[in-house]
Amino acid sequence: MLYGGATMDCALMETVFHDVPYTAGFKTFDKGKPVGQAHSTVEVAQPLRVVDLASAPLRKLGITRKQLIDTEKDRRPVTRQWAEALYRQCPDAQGLSWASRQDDSARAVALFGDRIPNGALKPLGASRAWWTTAMLMTRRSI
């Protein structure tokens, strides 16, 4: 699974800062989480088929955004089961897309790596360590 976002802020919020509490006020962050991880900026070179997890399509599946997207860490096993079920039931789907929980101004994606053909994602520059980018972002408000 490849996680991403339409913006760097969205990508950070959906990965490195995913488990930061969804509440106002002071927040803590495990500085060890991004160590050893990297991020890349890519261009989508060919159309990808993603399952839209916006509110209207979720209603058709009988689940709400609050039950699937706007969840805390303890619900991750359930969200993983939904992703696995959508993977099985939608053999042409190459991933999932939704409005980010912590940055709802941008779309987040989870791409099924085995369904993304070579050349579909073109790197724009070298990959960088998440640690550097995450530390720059913590100097701003999250």
Located regions from the model:
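Active-site and NAD+-binding cores of ADP-ribose-processing enzymes
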Residues: P21-I142
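Extended catalytic/binding region for NAD+/ADP-ribose chemistry, centered on the ART fold
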Residues: M1-T23
